[in-house]
From Swiss-Prot:
Protein name listed in UniProt: Uroporphyrinogen decarboxylase
Tagged with keyword Ribonucleoprotein: no
Gene3D superfamilies noted in UniProt: 3.20.20.210
Homology family: Belongs to the uroporphyrinogen decarboxylase family.
Function noted in UniProt: Catalyzes the decarboxylation of four acetate groups of uroporphyrinogen-III to yield coproporphyrinogen-III.
GO molecular function, one term: uroporphyrinogen decarboxylase activity
Protein backbone atom coordinates (compact mmCIF):
# COMPACT_ATOMS: atom_id res chain seq x y z
CA UNK A 1 0.00 0.00 0.00
CA UNK A 2 1.44 3.36 -1.01
CA UNK A 3 2.38 5.62 1.88
CA UNK A 4 0.90 9.09 2.12
CA UNK A 5 3.03 12.25 2.21
CA UNK A 6 4.56 13.11 5.57
CA UNK A 7 2.09 15.88 6.28
CA UNK A 8 -0.77 13.33 6.20
CA UNK A 9 1.12 10.84 8.39
CA UNK A 10 1.02 12.39 11.86
CA UNK A 11 3.92 10.47 13.39
CA UNK A 12 6.33 11.16 10.55
CA UNK A 13 5.35 14.82 10.53
CA UNK A 14 6.07 15.16 14.26
CA UNK A 15 9.38 13.33 13.95
CA UNK A 16 10.29 15.94 11.32
CA UNK A 17 9.59 18.74 13.77
CA UNK A 18 5.90 19.59 13.37
CA UNK A 19 3.56 19.74 16.34
CA UNK A 20 0.25 17.90 16.11
CA UNK A 21 -2.67 18.02 18.53
CA UNK A 22 -3.44 15.40 19.64
CA UNK A 23 0.04 13.92 19.45
CA UNK A 24 0.62 10.72 17.49
CA UNK A 25 0.82 7.53 19.53
CA UNK A 26 2.73 4.28 19.35
CA UNK A 27 4.06 2.08 22.15
CA UNK A 28 7.39 0.35 22.55
CA UNK A 29 6.87 -3.45 22.35
CA UNK A 30 3.35 -2.84 21.06
CA UNK A 31 3.70 -6.08 19.09
CA UNK A 32 4.12 -8.89 21.56
CA UNK A 33 3.04 -11.16 24.36
CA UNK A 34 0.22 -9.06 25.83
CA UNK A 35 -1.77 -9.62 22.60
CA UNK A 36 -3.76 -12.86 22.36
CA UNK A 37 -3.24 -12.96 18.59
CA UNK A 38 0.52 -12.87 19.13
CA UNK A 39 0.38 -15.71 21.64
CA UNK A 40 -1.73 -17.78 19.26
CA UNK A 41 0.75 -17.30 16.43
CA UNK A 42 3.74 -18.05 18.62
CA UNK A 43 2.24 -21.39 19.63
CA UNK A 44 2.40 -22.44 15.98
CA UNK A 45 5.94 -21.23 15.30
CA UNK A 46 8.21 -22.09 18.22
CA UNK A 47 10.62 -19.67 19.87
CA UNK A 48 11.27 -15.97 19.49
CA UNK A 49 14.12 -16.33 16.99
CA UNK A 50 12.05 -18.55 14.75
CA UNK A 51 9.44 -15.80 14.64
CA UNK A 52 11.96 -13.01 14.06
CA UNK A 53 13.57 -14.84 11.14
CA UNK A 54 10.26 -15.86 9.53
CA UNK A 55 9.42 -12.85 7.35
CA UNK A 56 5.75 -13.73 7.00
CA UNK A 57 5.28 -14.32 10.73
CA UNK A 58 7.27 -11.22 11.75
CA UNK A 59 5.29 -9.06 9.33
CA UNK A 60 2.02 -10.39 10.72
CA UNK A 61 3.17 -9.66 14.28
CA UNK A 62 4.22 -6.13 13.29
CA UNK A 63 0.77 -5.50 11.84
CA UNK A 64 -1.30 -7.02 14.67
CA UNK A 65 -1.35 -3.95 16.96
CA UNK A 66 -2.06 -1.67 14.00
CA UNK A 67 -5.17 -3.66 13.13
CA UNK A 68 -6.33 -3.83 16.75
CA UNK A 69 -5.55 -0.29 17.96
CA UNK A 70 -4.80 1.90 14.94
CA UNK A 71 -1.52 3.21 16.34
CA UNK A 72 0.08 6.02 14.34
CA UNK A 73 3.29 4.01 14.02
CA UNK A 74 4.18 0.39 13.37
CA UNK A 75 7.54 -0.82 14.66
CA UNK A 76 9.37 -3.73 13.10
CA UNK A 77 9.15 -6.97 15.07
CA UNK A 78 12.74 -8.03 15.65
CA UNK A 79 15.44 -7.79 18.35
CA UNK A 80 18.45 -5.59 19.06
CA UNK A 81 20.75 -8.65 19.14
CA UNK A 82 20.18 -9.63 15.52
CA UNK A 83 23.36 -7.73 14.61
CA UNK A 84 25.77 -9.68 16.89
CA UNK A 85 24.09 -12.86 15.66
CA UNK A 86 24.98 -11.80 12.11
CA UNK A 87 28.50 -10.89 13.29
CA UNK A 88 29.06 -14.50 14.34
CA UNK A 89 27.91 -14.91 17.92
CA UNK A 90 25.39 -17.58 18.87
CA UNK A 91 22.10 -16.10 20.09
CA UNK A 92 19.56 -17.93 22.21
CA UNK A 93 16.68 -16.92 24.44
CA UNK A 94 16.43 -18.65 27.80
CA UNK A 95 12.96 -18.86 29.35
CA UNK A 96 12.72 -16.37 32.19
CA UNK A 97 16.33 -15.23 31.81
CA UNK A 98 16.44 -13.22 28.60
CA UNK A 99 18.88 -13.37 25.67
CA UNK A 100 22.30 -15.01 25.78
CA UNK A 101 25.23 -14.46 23.39
CA UNK A 102 28.27 -16.71 23.06
CA UNK A 103 31.19 -16.81 22.80
CA UNK A 104 31.58 -13.62 24.84
CA UNK A 105 34.16 -10.97 24.01
CA UNK A 106 35.56 -10.62 27.53
CA UNK A 107 38.86 -12.17 26.42
CA UNK A 108 38.19 -12.58 22.70
CA UNK A 109 38.17 -10.19 19.76
CA UNK A 110 35.89 -9.79 16.77
CA UNK A 111 38.51 -11.61 14.70
CA UNK A 112 37.56 -14.78 16.59
CA UNK A 113 34.04 -14.63 15.17
CA UNK A 114 32.87 -15.79 11.75
CA UNK A 115 30.24 -13.38 10.39
CA UNK A 116 26.99 -14.70 8.90
CA UNK A 117 25.53 -11.62 7.15
CA UNK A 118 22.81 -13.70 5.47
CA UNK A 119 21.07 -13.84 8.86
CA UNK A 120 19.88 -10.27 8.26
CA UNK A 121 18.12 -10.96 4.95
CA UNK A 122 14.82 -12.16 6.49
CA UNK A 123 14.58 -8.87 8.41
CA UNK A 124 14.55 -6.91 5.17
CA UNK A 125 11.96 -9.32 3.84
CA UNK A 126 9.78 -8.50 6.84
CA UNK A 127 10.12 -4.78 6.13
CA UNK A 128 9.03 -5.22 2.52
CA UNK A 129 5.99 -7.27 3.53
CA UNK A 130 4.90 -4.77 6.18
CA UNK A 131 5.41 -1.83 3.85
CA UNK A 132 3.13 -3.43 1.28
CA UNK A 133 0.35 -4.08 3.81
CA UNK A 134 0.56 -1.06 6.13
CA UNK A 135 -2.26 1.52 6.09
CA UNK A 136 -1.18 4.56 4.11
CA UNK A 137 -1.47 6.93 7.07
CA UNK A 138 0.75 4.80 9.34
CA UNK A 139 4.44 5.57 9.81
CA UNK A 140 6.75 2.54 9.71
CA UNK A 141 9.62 2.49 12.23
CA UNK A 142 12.73 0.39 11.93
CA UNK A 143 15.19 0.03 14.77
CA UNK A 144 18.49 -1.25 16.06
CA UNK A 145 20.32 -1.39 19.34
CA UNK A 146 22.82 1.40 19.92
CA UNK A 147 26.50 0.36 19.86
CA UNK A 148 27.05 0.67 23.64
CA UNK A 149 24.06 -1.46 24.58
CA UNK A 150 24.74 -4.13 21.95
CA UNK A 151 28.40 -4.20 23.02
CA UNK A 152 27.38 -4.93 26.62
CA UNK A 153 25.71 -8.14 25.48
CA UNK A 154 28.57 -9.06 23.15
CA UNK A 155 31.14 -8.70 25.92
CA UNK A 156 29.25 -10.15 28.88
CA UNK A 157 26.90 -12.49 27.04
CA UNK A 158 23.83 -11.13 28.82
CA UNK A 159 22.35 -7.97 30.25
CA UNK A 160 22.89 -6.74 33.81
CA UNK A 161 21.85 -3.53 35.51
CA UNK A 162 25.38 -2.27 36.26
CA UNK A 163 27.14 -3.73 33.19
CA UNK A 164 30.24 -4.29 35.33
CA UNK A 165 31.89 -6.81 32.99
CA UNK A 166 31.66 -4.51 29.98
CA UNK A 167 32.68 -1.40 31.88
CA UNK A 168 35.75 -3.22 33.22
CA UNK A 169 36.75 -4.19 29.69
CA UNK A 170 36.30 -0.60 28.49
CA UNK A 171 38.57 0.66 31.30
CA UNK A 172 41.20 -2.08 30.98
CA UNK A 173 41.32 -2.32 27.19
CA UNK A 174 39.90 0.90 25.73
CA UNK A 175 41.45 0.29 22.32
CA UNK A 176 39.99 -3.20 22.11
CA UNK A 177 36.60 -2.00 23.27
CA UNK A 178 36.74 0.90 20.82
CA UNK A 179 37.24 -1.65 18.04
CA UNK A 180 34.01 -3.37 19.07
CA UNK A 181 32.14 -0.05 19.14
CA UNK A 182 33.55 0.97 15.74
CA UNK A 183 32.52 -2.35 14.21
CA UNK A 184 29.04 -1.92 15.63
CA UNK A 185 28.75 1.60 14.22
CA UNK A 186 29.59 0.23 10.77
CA UNK A 187 27.27 -2.77 11.05
CA UNK A 188 24.39 -0.75 12.50
CA UNK A 189 24.63 1.99 9.89
CA UNK A 190 24.46 -0.60 7.11
CA UNK A 191 21.64 -2.52 8.81
CA UNK A 192 19.46 0.55 9.33
CA UNK A 193 20.25 1.84 5.86
CA UNK A 194 18.98 -1.41 4.37
CA UNK A 195 15.86 -1.23 6.53
CA UNK A 196 15.24 2.25 5.11
CA UNK A 197 15.85 1.05 1.56
CA UNK A 198 13.37 -1.79 2.17
CA UNK A 199 10.66 0.61 3.30
CA UNK A 200 10.81 2.02 6.85
CA UNK A 201 10.10 5.74 7.27
CA UNK A 202 12.15 6.42 10.41
CA UNK A 203 14.41 4.50 12.78
CA UNK A 204 14.94 4.28 16.53
CA UNK A 205 18.19 3.56 18.35
CA UNK A 206 17.57 1.68 21.59
CA UNK A 207 20.30 2.36 24.17
CA UNK A 208 18.77 0.35 27.00
CA UNK A 209 21.90 0.40 29.20
CA UNK A 210 22.98 4.02 28.62
CA UNK A 211 22.22 4.82 32.25
CA UNK A 212 25.01 2.59 33.55
CA UNK A 213 27.81 4.95 32.49
CA UNK A 214 29.55 7.84 34.25
CA UNK A 215 29.55 11.17 32.35
CA UNK A 216 32.96 10.83 30.66
CA UNK A 217 32.26 7.26 29.60
CA UNK A 218 28.77 8.26 28.46
CA UNK A 219 30.36 10.84 26.19
CA UNK A 220 32.75 8.29 24.65
CA UNK A 221 30.61 5.16 24.44
CA UNK A 222 27.10 6.57 23.94
CA UNK A 223 27.23 10.08 22.49
CA UNK A 224 30.21 9.70 20.13
CA UNK A 225 29.12 6.48 18.37
CA UNK A 226 25.50 7.64 18.21
CA UNK A 227 26.61 10.87 16.57
CA UNK A 228 28.60 8.88 13.99
CA UNK A 229 25.57 6.73 13.24
CA UNK A 230 23.23 9.69 12.89
CA UNK A 231 25.63 11.52 10.55
CA UNK A 232 25.90 8.48 8.31
CA UNK A 233 22.17 7.87 8.20
CA UNK A 234 21.36 11.52 7.52
CA UNK A 235 23.96 11.60 4.74
CA UNK A 236 22.62 8.45 3.10
CA UNK A 237 18.94 9.11 3.71
CA UNK A 238 18.11 12.82 4.02
CA UNK A 239 14.72 13.40 5.59
CA UNK A 240 14.56 10.05 7.39
CA UNK A 241 14.25 10.85 11.12
CA UNK A 242 16.36 9.12 13.76
CA UNK A 243 14.96 8.71 17.29
CA UNK A 244 17.47 8.20 20.10
CA UNK A 245 16.37 6.44 23.28
CA UNK A 246 19.17 6.51 25.89
CA UNK A 247 17.31 4.86 28.75
CA UNK A 248 18.48 6.02 32.18
CA UNK A 249 20.51 8.95 30.82
CA UNK A 250 18.76 11.40 33.14
CA UNK A 251 20.72 14.63 33.48
CA UNK A 252 22.91 13.67 30.52
CA UNK A 253 19.93 13.93 28.13
CA UNK A 254 20.55 17.56 27.11
CA UNK A 255 24.12 16.78 26.05
CA UNK A 256 22.91 13.68 24.21
CA UNK A 257 20.28 15.71 22.36
CA UNK A 258 22.70 18.50 21.42
CA UNK A 259 25.68 16.40 20.41
CA UNK A 260 24.23 13.34 18.66
CA UNK A 261 22.10 15.13 16.09
CA UNK A 262 19.08 12.87 16.62
CA UNK A 263 15.76 14.18 15.34
CA UNK A 264 13.84 13.06 18.43
CA UNK A 265 14.72 11.94 21.95
CA UNK A 266 12.85 9.23 23.81
CA UNK A 267 12.33 9.79 27.54
CA UNK A 268 12.10 6.93 30.00
CA UNK A 269 9.54 7.06 32.80
CA UNK A 270 12.04 8.41 35.37
CA UNK A 271 12.43 11.71 33.49
CA UNK A 272 10.27 14.62 34.63
CA UNK A 273 8.56 15.82 31.43
CA UNK A 274 8.58 19.44 32.61
CA UNK A 275 12.33 19.24 33.23
CA UNK A 276 12.85 17.73 29.78
CA UNK A 277 10.79 20.46 28.14
CA UNK A 278 12.82 23.14 29.93
CA UNK A 279 16.26 21.63 29.31
CA UNK A 280 16.19 19.95 25.91
CA UNK A 281 16.90 22.02 22.77
CA UNK A 282 13.96 24.17 21.73
CA UNK A 283 11.88 22.59 19.00
CA UNK A 284 13.38 19.12 19.38
CA UNK A 285 10.78 16.37 19.20
CA UNK A 286 10.38 14.37 22.40
CA UNK A 287 8.84 10.93 22.77
CA UNK A 288 7.37 9.31 25.84
CA UNK A 289 7.08 8.79 28.68
CA UNK A 290 4.21 7.05 30.44
CA UNK A 291 5.24 4.57 33.14
CA UNK A 292 4.37 1.09 31.78
CA UNK A 293 3.03 0.22 35.24
CA UNK A 294 0.54 3.08 35.01
CA UNK A 295 -0.78 1.42 31.88
CA UNK A 296 -1.00 -1.94 33.65
CA UNK A 297 -2.83 -0.32 36.58
CA UNK A 298 -5.40 1.58 34.52
CA UNK A 299 -8.27 3.56 35.99
CA UNK A 300 -8.11 7.17 37.11
CA UNK A 301 -4.41 6.81 37.88
CA UNK A 302 -3.77 6.12 34.20
CA UNK A 303 -5.89 9.09 33.16
CA UNK A 304 -4.02 11.40 35.53
CA UNK A 305 -0.61 10.20 34.31
CA UNK A 306 -1.62 10.60 30.66
CA UNK A 307 -2.97 14.10 31.23
CA UNK A 308 0.22 15.19 33.01
CA UNK A 309 2.33 14.16 30.03
CA UNK A 310 -0.04 15.72 27.50
CA UNK A 311 0.24 19.05 29.31
CA UNK A 312 4.01 19.01 29.78
CA UNK A 313 5.21 20.03 26.30
CA UNK A 314 3.46 23.26 25.25
CA UNK A 315 4.53 24.22 21.75
CA UNK A 316 6.95 21.30 21.39
CA UNK A 317 6.56 18.39 18.95
CA UNK A 318 5.62 15.34 21.02
CA UNK A 319 5.07 11.65 20.31
CA UNK A 320 3.07 9.91 23.03
CA UNK A 321 4.70 6.65 24.08
CA UNK A 322 5.71 4.67 27.13
CA UNK A 323 8.91 5.20 29.08
CA UNK A 324 9.91 1.62 28.23
CA UNK A 325 8.33 -1.46 26.67
CA UNK A 326 4.73 -2.49 27.31
CA UNK A 327 4.49 -5.15 30.01
CA UNK A 328 3.21 -8.69 29.54
CA UNK A 329 0.30 -8.28 31.97
CA UNK A 330 -1.07 -5.12 30.34
CA UNK A 331 -4.84 -5.43 29.79
CA UNK A 332 -6.09 -4.70 26.27
CA UNK A 333 -8.79 -2.46 27.72
CA UNK A 334 -6.16 -0.23 29.32
CA UNK A 335 -4.46 0.34 25.98
CA UNK A 336 -7.83 1.27 24.51
CA UNK A 337 -8.42 3.66 27.41
CA UNK A 338 -5.00 5.24 26.87
CA UNK A 339 -5.71 5.85 23.19
CA UNK A 340 -9.13 7.32 23.92
CA UNK A 341 -7.58 9.65 26.51
CA UNK A 342 -4.78 10.85 24.23
CA UNK A 343 -6.97 11.29 21.18
CA UNK A 344 -9.82 12.90 23.07
Amino acid sequence: MAALPAETRPLLAVLRGERRDPPPVWLMRQAGRYLPEYRALRETKGGFLELAYDSDAAAEITLQPIRRFGFDGAILFSDILIIPHAMGQDLRFEAGEGPRLSPTLVDRTLADLEPVPARLEPIYGTVRRVRAALPAETTFLGFAGSPWTVATYMVAGQGSREQAETRRKAYRDPAGFQAIIDALVDATADYLSKQIEAGVDAVQLFDSWAGSLAPREFERWVIAPTAQLVRRLHARHPGVPVIGFPKGAGGKLPAYARETGVDAVGLDETVDPAWAHANLPEGLTVQGNLDPLALVSGGEGLDTAVDAILGAFPGRPHVFNLGHGILLDTPIAHVERLLARVRG
